[in-house]
Amino acid sequence: MVTEAQVVWVQKTLGVTRRAEPADGTTPTGGGAGDASGGGVFDDIKQFVVDLFTGKKAVKPADPVPRVELGKAQTDRADKLVAAMPKEDQSKVGELLEKAKPEEKKYLQKALASSHSAAELDAFYKQIAGKDKAWMDVNLHVVGDSKGQGVKQQWECSCGPTTIQAMKGELDPIYALKLRTDNPHLTEAKDDDATALNPNMAADQKAILVAHGGIATNRDTDGKGIALGGALNEQKGVTGLKFDTEDVPDDKFDARLAELDSALSGGLPVPIRVSSPGATGGHFVLVVGGELGPPRVYSIHDPWDGKIIKASEADIKAKKLNIAGWTQITHIYKPSADVPTVGS
């Protein structure tokens, strides 16, 4: 049994303590790790202590995330975008889809639905042709690798921008491959220097954060988060999705969960906001998969730790989550397709 004294000893040794999360309390904002009631860095300390004093892992690493199939929203958008292309480009895309293997074709269609040109699709096909499924599962996604790891927020309060990066990486394999190529340490972050490991990814996160009124600071310094709805909907031209911000009161829990299931079964990841009863702060994460069960279990990417967390319906309903110190879902950002009109 690990004692509180051992935890305190490690805190003093590492120079880390629990941290409070600032928020204005007027909009569903999100920032970094949990509030002063615990979680986040403090949970990492407890895990480290358990590993140090017992030689055992406190938490079993998450299994790799089952990849959702290409959904109707993206296939419909891909078809519409092809139809809007010049005839020469239509022929080029048709040839690519014809010669691609089934797994390659799926990713080509996802890239097409993400507004890439025929030339970009051709270059992408040359990068993935002949690659096996295991390679694609890692390199064409930015969450849920074989260790359950993925893209990590580089700034204290950039959970919203990082959730957007994770969402785009699940929808757009060209974006995912470039993000991985440009940021070989995207599952890591340096707490006292946000630009040390992944300067390109950090710059993108900061740009979204600052554009929406946030303040970018190193992970070990208090910053300011943002509301997510506007930043999500700015991606519509690329993703083809619009997002409705919906709260999750107790009397609408089942309805919101049904909406979540519907989106996931249609191949769409779902951003959500988590907080705790009585707290003003919060944290944005991305639901990337679900198992209908029973029991229903959801795979949630936490950008603070850069890891997949498994959450059961029972734990969600009982407000017993432990995501960066937060315990309940307060909002979901419901995606819906915005299919372009041919010729628009």
Q: Where in the sequence are the language-model features?
A:
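Active-site nucleophile-adjacent alpha helix/oxyanion-hole segment immediately C-terminal to the catalytic cysteine
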Residues: 2, 64, 68, 73-76, ...
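Non-catalytic, low-structured ubiquitin/UBL-interacting segments
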Residues: 2-148
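Conserved active-site-adjacent core of cysteine acyl-enzyme catalytic domains
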Residues: 63-66, 73, 97, 124-127, ...
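Alpha-helix initiation and N-capping motif
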Residues: 75, 90, 105, 118-121, ...
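Residue-level recognition of short, well-ordered coil/turn positions
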Residues: 101, 174, 267-268
